[in-house]
Amino acid sequence: SSAQPLSLEEIQKLLAQDCLHLVCAVDEDERILGMLSLVVFDIPTGRRAWIEDVVTDQAARGQGVGQGLVDAAVEHARELGAKTVDLTSRPTREAANRLYRRVGFLQRETNVYRKSF
């Protein structure tokens, strides 16, 4: 599902979290072409990372923006000491799923559950 636009205050609150890293791709005029959220956190089995909210501008699709974002996020997670990087993607997002496999993500044999409030 798509998120509603955020206010400046909401963005500042997100960015104040130590665990959240926003990865952005910009063009030569500093226009945002895409972005993703990288969350890095510690649990008893080690430091982990999670990629969420991968978004690429419609006009920039097919130009390597998504791959650049994912590659940068994975490298940043590695630099921060994460043992793994996880993400989810709907089966209907065929291009995104091809990208994730191409850059080395493996589909896990698990179920993902969610409880919404």
Named regions from a protein language model:
Residues 56, 62-75, 98-103:
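Conserved acetyl-CoA-binding loop-helix of GNAT-fold acetyltransferases
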Residues 47-58:
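Conserved acetyl-CoA binding element of GNAT-fold acetyltransferases
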Residues 1-46, 70-71, 76, 107, ...:
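Acetyl-CoA-dependent GNAT
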Residues 67, 79, 91-109, 114-115:
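Conserved active-site alpha-helix within GNAT-family acetyltransferase domains
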Residues 70, 77-89:
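Conserved GNAT acetyl-CoA-binding A-motif
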Residues 41-43, 59, 92:
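Short coil/turn motifs at secondary-structure junctions
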